[in-house]
Amino acid sequence: MRRFIAIVFMALAGFGAALAHAQQRYAVISLIGDRMEIAYAKGVEGQPVDRIERRYIALDDSRIDRYTLLAANEVIKKVVPGPDPVLLQAFDRSYFEVSAGTGAIIEWTRQLVKDAKPRVTHAIVITKIQYEGVPAIQKAFVGGGTLEGVGFFVGREAPPKGMDPNSGGPGFLSPFAYFQVTLVDLSTGKVVREEKGTASTALSATNTDSGNAWDALSAERKLQTIIDLVKRELEIVLPKVLKGA
């Protein structure tokens, strides 16, 4: 009898959780695709220090954010089936800054979705973060340092044995996507849960005609590589944010 009661309680608890999710609706905002960071290893003399040169390429279209929203939409529908999420794009560049926080974008979201039916209860905000993401193989050359948002680290491998350790070997290209997914209760403005996504990989430049690591991918492939990286990481991170929300 006790076992039967325990099973009933577990079933009711599961039903209650499913009902709570069914009553929730999400607005999703992606703020990672306004620019791409390109980081280079500078020439090194002496002991390794932070010797990273950073440049930024402004992205006039919003393809990275659009595909991020579509990827988030797929995950939400799979993990917490319910009303269709509301996918929002922001074009005010001030929202994209790492230091901007989520206060202003949450108020902006509230105003946009206040008349939506069914009611939007939560916002999922995807923002850039700074992360100690220098590839391990590069730390002998550049020391520590942070990378931000989405982009590429253009690096060099260790030189062949017996050569000057400050002379680089073959170059490589390391795409990265460093972002945070934050779940916010729109009724209170409080953060419910947040998780960081820290994805990167490395591509050798040994097969390029120029030997330049930047030429390892075409411009279109660079963009698609970042989109794929974000999508794969979202599929890992977003379910953690939604769990128990």
Where are the language model's segments positioned?
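Bacterial Sec-dependent signal peptides at the C-terminal "C-region" and cleavage site
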Residues: 15-23
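N-terminal segment of the mature soluble domain
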Residues: 41-163, 176-180, 184-190, 194-195
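C-terminal/domain-edge helix-coil "capping" segments
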Residues: 22-38, 139-144, 150, 154-245
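Bacterial N-terminal signal peptides
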Residues: 6-16
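A broad, low-specificity signal marking well-ordered, structured residues that form hydrophobic/aromatic
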Residues: 14, 26, 124
